[in-house]
């Protein structure tokens, strides 16, 4: 007969009616008993013939594709002019005096951040925007393009202008000017000015002779409109495999591709197809390139840098065969849903491409992308705004993967020791935290995103049209992309984006100028940055507490008035460094801080209410006697594991689930095991702060016996049969706690010290976790342990009790590395009326 829930509780000593602990507890270490209980609860039966269950409530398998929901009305968030001050170290020194080694090192890591991948795989531009929403292909394309454009305008992305140059907006950093790969090449007075790009110092761009020469030809500009003969496109050589050698021109100013093996030709331009608004530039350039590079027989495109001339001149005057969008103007409409009708809505569609305020040299950047992008909801609570997801997972996969640096995250006990206090709390919201940290320009070629232009994107996804690479596009071929869906989508989008539809329909390649979210390096850098800033704030205001995890920054002070003064001072300091805070999202928590999914108060820590509700829902939906897919079990364990430290039996209670996940087998919940777990999670106990103290109780054991030293009293006992030494030591610690009630116990066993009881026999682990809950352990060497003699059966010998002081740890968060006392270079601060007369140190 299966074990009933009541019997199981008694067995685990969770009920009071159990016999003396010294007899009952060692029985739980018995292998035979553990095996019988596992059989009764159906824990060991991993091989099942019934089909697995793949969904429990909201939990589906770890690799199942939960299809994100597309919102046609998404708004692109605005990014303020984020520019982290380059002299951030000096500004911090002015604020707090000399920086500690730790703070200095961390701030130097991100000024600028560097990225060294082992191997970079370049993908075709078609993979730039992921077709995540097949129903909303065109809409998603334009929303994503608009998001990328917004990031570029905010100075977060570089725009690839040519193989070795890029343009960007915003304030340049010194490394974007001084370095060989980051020299500032152009600076223009107007952002999208109508002047042509011209180098201000010789020899900075590759093939610098092209620049001034074209400028002079632009001034003359004697070439009138030419008949459209379309020979240039027809003569393109397709062997280079570069996207630039394909049908439509690129926005980075590529002019054409030299025919393979041609000699010096001077009349190329006059025969090339042209459009009036760019005829002078294109022809001058093409004849010049043909002359200067005439003997080259490579099929590679040659770069030419220019601004589009003033777009106020109408672009409808000449034939426009270079631009897919404007070509429709000169064609006959193929149906009532032809794009011709949209293109003729307005005269002036604006320039084909835009250029940034500044231009820099970059390492060689191919016309490719290294990761795809798509849009999702900003977060579960905000579905009106979109968030860009960047997939640079290639750097985390395969043999060439980058092993990202590890960094310390405070565990639950350290966090409680640090933050559980009677302070008033407030949390700050850093807007777009990742986009604060600048990347070195040399990283740009590895972090490329972009799109191949609307025509290719639509063609790739529609079944009835095919764009054949390097084939001259005929009029009929042009209309292949016309369809009712595309027409309706573009008409709706025209209301939103207006003439930007034209700009967004062109191909573009963008590289990251600030750290992107899709790379494993970014969380590490952000954690280093915010922890260094908080360290500076803590030293400036020793009577307060500032702490951060990633972009979550919290401030604590003894009273509300004090907290408000601190908030004003810290906000001004952060703004002076160039850190953007979102004042609308500042939250004042009172005395219970909500942080990292926990509620932390003076009484200790508990999980937040929404997590408790999730757990209740999970148990409500959990099926009994049905095998559940181990991937779904991973999800369940993830949720239950977060709240495990707040239950009686802790992590050991989940061990059967862990075992089935490790074996990649389905798990079947028996009614008793489910009832046991749900009762465990029904009553959650806070994890309390550890207090410093003097250790008075010691425990020790040998495989055959145990000994305790409680003050001046000594006790000993023997086990019925010899036990493994770690099990014996754990039992001794449990006896010490139950006999003395002390929350501080000295032991010489490292496994007991670690307080991880998952490797012990299952029943013993569960019971020990409950008995030792809230106990702190101090290490005492065996030779000095007063309980060593009693454990060996010698009660007569008394070793003196040690004066063992216990100091609770705040973890490896490098928070309280005692910094050398630094003389402040500031005049004495005016002290506001503060209830504190002493510096507040962490509890």
From Swiss-Prot:
Residues 223-235 have a biased composition (Low complexity). It catalyses: DNA(n) + a 2'-deoxyribonucleoside 5'-triphosphate = DNA(n+1) + diphosphate; Endonucleolytic cleavage to 5'-phosphomonoester. It comes from the Viruses. Residues 357-600 form the Reverse transcriptase domain. Residues 219-250 are annotated as: Disordered. InterPro entries: DNA/RNA_pol_sf, DNApol_viral_C, DNApol_viral_N, HBV_DPOL, Rev_trsase/Diguanyl_cyclase, RT_dom, Viral_Replic_Matur_Polypro. Pfam families: DNA_pol_viral_C (PF00336), DNA_pol_viral_N (PF00242), RVT_1 (PF00078). Residues 178-346 are annotated as: Spacer. Mg(2+) binds at residues 429, 551-552. Its EC number is 2.7.7.7, 2.7.7.49, 3.1.26.4. The record marks 63 as: Priming of reverse-transcription by covalently linking the first nucleotide of the (-)DNA. This is Protein P. It comes from Hepatitis B virus genotype B2 (isolate Vietnam/16091/1992). The gene is P.
